[in-house]
Amino acid sequence: MTPMMHERVRNMFGDAGLTVGFTVQKLVYDDPEDLTQAVMVFRPNGGSNIRHDLGSEHHVLVDVIGAKDKRGDAANAVQHIVDYVQANPMADECVGYIQNMGAIPAPVLTAEGRIVFRLQFACTYGE
């Protein structure tokens, strides 16, 4: 079975070293109950119609959730991710062409004081 696109993006980011220092999760945020842990969550977020033998656009959300009081570290990680994708839009043949959608959004804070950036990517892929 072919991995879902959010899993392929997770693998691409991991291979590029972009997830170092983060607990990596899929689909939904699962609180690690340790405010010193930063978390990165990969999940699908729709896209275009998926047709056989045609390219399709898959949208992937990547939530970058910083450790408590480590806002600068989370912001730096977000910038590294965006810079990497911009410089390497075709780094992984399993992802196809990836691009950031909407640049870097305004962060939000959780009740615990964690900063959260929600990045969205469009992956154009077809076989």
Task: Identify what each model region corresponds to.
Residues A38-V39, H59, R118:
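A residue-level signal for beta-strand positions that form part of recognition/binding surfaces
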Residues I65-M90:
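Mid-chain, well-packed structural core segment of small domains
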Residues M1-H52, N88-C94:
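Small/polar-rich, solvent-exposed N-terminal microdomains that initiate assembly or binding
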Residues E57-G66:
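Active-site-adjacent structural patch at catalytic or cofactor/ligand-binding sites
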Residues H52-S56, G72-A75:
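Generic alpha-helical scaffold signal
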Residues L18-G21, Q25, K70, N76, ...:
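Intrinsically disordered, low-complexity, compositionally biased regions/tails
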Residues M1-M12, N45-G55, G96-E127:
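Short, charged interaction patches at domain edges and termini
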